[in-house]
Amino acid sequence: MKGLYQVTAMRAKKIISEEVYGNIAEKDTLFNRLMTRHKIPHARRHEWKLQEVKLNKEIND
């Protein structure tokens, strides 16, 4: 299901969250878009863990 998702990730005690567009079946893509928006380099992304993916708005194509 495509739409706008609120994606949250955590590293140690730091939490980042952002609304990103994507498909719920592709959680890796949603996670990567979150990391890109917060300018987290690829070498440091393994430190972050996906916490929550919540649908904000469904978009039908």
Regions found by a protein language model. Name each.
Residues 1-15:
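Short aromatic-glycine-(Arg/Gly/Cys) micro-motifs in beta-strand/loop hairpins
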Residues 4-8, 20-22, 49:
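Ordered hydrophobic segments in well-structured contexts
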Residues 8-11, 24, 42:
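Residue-level detector of intrinsically disordered, flexible termini
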Residues 32-61:
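Short, mixed-charge low-complexity intrinsically disordered segments
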Residues 14-26:
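A short, exposed loop/beta-hairpin motif centered on an aromatic-Gly-Thr core
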